[in-house]
């Protein structure tokens, strides 16, 4: 799985799940053979109840997609995370994305035991997620080293923004797949040893994302993708990507759940310009 899409969760204006838009989004990804990651930070999982999350996973699995489904496992409660993994075992998903514990800032021993416990329960391939900007701590190198040989440690998603740290992960073991978790850093992280991308921008540009992953050295595309990624990162994810998806009518509404708000998108007036810029992608074969 070289490319996975970190899927948004579409909501209706009353903040309930918009299942029609959700199916449209997943079919959009299926056409380009992308795996999907549900209920990560892009999917606003922390704002959803356990019942809502299960309904989303159940609905996605009922679509019989021809691409793998990976489900996010966030939180700080080991019991709740374990129960969520147990719930998901009832569905034909491919595996899990297990986030570094948020807010509690454990040391290396606590973090290692946390991941080991959840990997033992997973019984499916799992991707460990380094996201220090949200969790408050990095995914420690010693934790990765200790767990590298675990049979369910399939991959590592690195959204830490440090090329040096990415290199250290890549040099540690060939037993797991290293995924870039930042659209704009794909070329640099590929050079460091990343072999896959978990993308936010592929929600709206799945074909372009596939071409981007297959040819990270195309300078014109790299510059264009980096510019759009920079625009996206002006505000907290998934505010901007939802605005783009709604503008392009991939989803019906740009609704977010508090504490996220579409009013925090200060660059909304530039959405048509961003769409126009990405329309140049199809001419990129003339720019090498």
From Swiss-Prot:
One of its GO terms (biological process) is lysine biosynthetic process via diaminopimelate. Its EC number is 4.3.3.7. Keywords: Amino-acid biosynthesis, Cytoplasm, Diaminopimelate biosynthesis, Lyase, Lysine biosynthesis, Schiff base. The record marks 41, 103 as: Part of a proton relay during catalysis. The active site is at residues 129, 157. GO terms for cellular component: cytosol. It is found in: Cytoplasm. Catalyzes the condensation of (S)-aspartate-beta-semialdehyde [(S)-ASA] and pyruvate to 4-hydroxy-tetrahydrodipicolinate (HTPA). NCBIfam families: dapA. This is 4-hydroxy-tetrahydrodipicolinate synthase. It comes from Chlamydia abortus (strain DSM 27085 / S26/3) (Chlamydophila abortus). The lineage of its organism: Bacteria, Pseudomonadati, Chlamydiota, Chlamydiia, Chlamydiales. The gene is dapA.
């Amino acid at each position: 799985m070289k490319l996975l899409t970190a899927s948004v969760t579409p909501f209706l204006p009353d903040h309930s799940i918009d299942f029609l838009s959700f199916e449209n989004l997943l079919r959009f990804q299926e056409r380009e053979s992308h795996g999907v990651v549900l209920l990560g930070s892009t999917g606003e999982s922390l704002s959803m109840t356990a019942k809502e999350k299960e309904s989303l996973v159940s609905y996605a699995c009922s679509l019989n997609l021809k691409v793998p489904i990976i489900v996010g496992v966030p939180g700080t409660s080991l019991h709740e995370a374990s129960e969520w993994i147990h719930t998901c075992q009832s569905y034909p998903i491919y595996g899990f994305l297990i986030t570094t514990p948020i807010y509690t800032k454990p040391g290396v021993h606590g973090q290692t035991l946390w991941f080991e416990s959840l990997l033992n329960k997973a019984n499916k391939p799992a991707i460990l997620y380094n996201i220090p900007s949200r969790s408050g701590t990095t995914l420690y190198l010693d934790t990765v080293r200790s767990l590298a040989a675990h049979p369910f440690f399939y991959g590592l998603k690195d959204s830490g923004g440090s090329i040096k740290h990415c290199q250290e992960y890549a040099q540690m073991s060939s037993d797991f797949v290293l995924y870039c978790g930042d659209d704009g850093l794909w070329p640099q992280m590929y050079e460091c040893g990343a072999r896959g991308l978990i993308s936010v921008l592929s929600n709206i540009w799945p074909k372009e994302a596939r071409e981007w992953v297959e040819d990270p050295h195309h300078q014109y595309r790299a510059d264009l993708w980096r510019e759009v990624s920079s625009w996206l990162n002006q505000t907290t994810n998934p505010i901007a990507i939802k605005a783009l998806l709604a503008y392009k009518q991939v989803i019906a509404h740009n609704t977010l759940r508090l504490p996220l708000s579409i009013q925090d998108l200060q660059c909304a007036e530039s959405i048509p310009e961003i769409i126009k810029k990405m329309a140049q992608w199809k001419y990129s074969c003339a720019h090498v």
